[in-house]
């Protein structure tokens, strides 16, 4: 099996770029952020503070997270319920950052992620794929873009969906998320030593996909 580990900050386009590249390569795309978001959604639904590590840990035995692959893409199932459309809100995003800093949560999901890579050729994206989850991946990418460019892209996404967005507020959220992700004690966001740095601040979406596909084909 061939594994591609893609790490990088929130809003750099990891998921959309990896998904398109996986389709072109015939690989399975694994959005690990969606897995953590599913945990965070359950925590919020239970009225638990996502920063309260013991309380979050107590919920884990009662959570069943499954990934289902359909022609439309990866679906997230939480205790049998399809929650794919419920995990992208700002509230869930901030709760995800807190939950993912809890060692017990990361340990809970680690084997699920590794099992997917053992059984499939995968493009897996997240925050610590190349450093922790798949340290032996054949290719590691650190995909990033400037906070300002990531905020602009998010505003454009929301506008396309017919939603108003405050650029300055989104930029602050991104900067706060970057700080939390890079300063947490457990698996902080950082490039693996042997990762290829891919800054797509000035790339179109298609250019990012083509660059990623090219890197994979060079290594295979």
Regions found by a protein language model. Name each.
Residues 33, 80, 109, 123, ...:
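Residue-level signal for inorganic ion chemistry
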Residues 9:
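P-loop (Walker A) phosphate-binding loop of NTP-binding proteins
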Residues 6:
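Hydrophobic anchor at the beta1->P-loop junction of P-loop NTPases
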Residues 68, 113-119, 130-132, 136, ...:
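Small-molecule kinase domains that catalyze NTP-dependent phosphoryl transfer to phosphate-bearing small molecules
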Residues 17:
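Hydrophobic positions on the alpha1 helix immediately C-terminal to the Walker A/P-loop
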Residues 23-89:
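N-terminal phosphate/diphosphate-binding loop that engages ATP/GTP or pyrophosphate donors
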Residues 84-161:
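ATP-dependent NMP and nucleoside kinases share a basic, alpha-helical "lid"
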Residues 14:
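Conserved lysine of the Walker
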């Amino acid at each position: 099996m061939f594994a591609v580990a893609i790490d990088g900050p929130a809003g750099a386009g990891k998921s959309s770029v990896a998904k398109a590249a996986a389709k072109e390569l015939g690989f399975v795309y694994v959005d690990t952020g969606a897995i953590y978001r599913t945990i965070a959604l359950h925590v919020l639904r239970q009225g638990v503070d996502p920063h309260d590590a013991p309380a979050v840990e107590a919920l884990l035995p009662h959570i069943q997270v499954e990934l289902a692959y359909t022609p439309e893409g990866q679906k997230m199932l939480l205790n049998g319920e399809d929650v794919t459309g419920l995990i992208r809100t700002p509230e869930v995003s901030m709760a995800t950052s807190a939950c993912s800093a809890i060692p017990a949560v990361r340990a809970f999901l680690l084997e699920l992620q590794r099992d997917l890579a053992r059984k499939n050729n995968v493009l897996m994206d997240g925050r610590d794929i190349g450093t922790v989850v798949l340290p032996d991946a054949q290719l590691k990418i650190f995909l990033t873009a400037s906070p300002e460019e990531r905020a602009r892209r998010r505003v454009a996404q929301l506008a396309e969906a017919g939603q108003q967005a405050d650029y300055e507020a989104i930029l602050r959220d991104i900067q706060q998320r970057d700080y939390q992700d890079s300063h947490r004690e457990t698996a902080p966001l950082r490039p693996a030593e042997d990762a290829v740095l891919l800054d797509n601040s000035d790339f179109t979406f298609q250019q990012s996909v083509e660059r990623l596909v090219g890197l994979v084909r060079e290594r295979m």
